[in-house]
Amino acid sequence: MRHKFNLSNRVARKFQNPVPVSVPKPEEKDPVPESQGPAEARPLIITSRTDTGLVRRNNQDAVIQGSGLLGIADGMGGHNGGETASAGAREGMLQALEGREPSEEALEEAISQVNQALWNRQLEDTSLSGMGTTLTVLWPAGDRMLIGHVGDSRAYLLREGHLRQVTQDHSMVADMVRRGLLTEEQASTHPMRNYITRAVGTEPTIQADILSLERQAGDQWLVCSDGLHGLLSREDLERLMVETNLEEAADEMLRLALDRGGRDNISLILAREDQAGEVAE
């Protein structure tokens, strides 16, 4: 069972709901160029997938797409808490940043506002106590890509055939890897691999990682929940992004995660930096 461990040493668990809750999935469309607003350097060609998986009874992931934002929120909490948290993060981020000029300050402020709103919500409704969500979002800003990150969903960048993880997991085992106490291989099977040290909404304040990376023509970006990266290695993801087009890569990533057990909800967004004269696949 999945656990979320926050900085006050409270443990919130990612439960299966006792009663199935219907959650509409984002419509799966062919990838199309999406405008990124007034600071646009080039359009992104985007496709996304989300699936409940083979074990859980409902989907607590939320795909964020709109207002120039691309992201994943992976909710946690019993009853409807996980869905409430991830959906609240999605709607809160879209509302907070609608029409705003992209900046690191605006992104950090939006995440803080969402965190406060979710925290207040569970104070008002004790049935939501312990809810929270990961949050990893991309926000194009001219020739830069802004990234906001809390938790263990991930953002990757594929450039010149090499895939690298650009966010750092806020998890117990990731901290142990960074301190040299575990190898990445050991971390992948460690019994505490599903404990995270930061989540949106579990405390009155939040410290988000805010990154700014250069955008280059032909770059590919991947944002995904742990339901994907927990079952597919970096090498798996890199191979699919290099050898197949955007749509095929998304389909194959989802298929492989399901074939390997689909233990959690699976969500991903793939985006490619458009090049002159390029059309959607």
Predicted features, each with a name:
Residues 1-281:
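PP2C/PPM-type serine/threonine phosphatase catalytic domain
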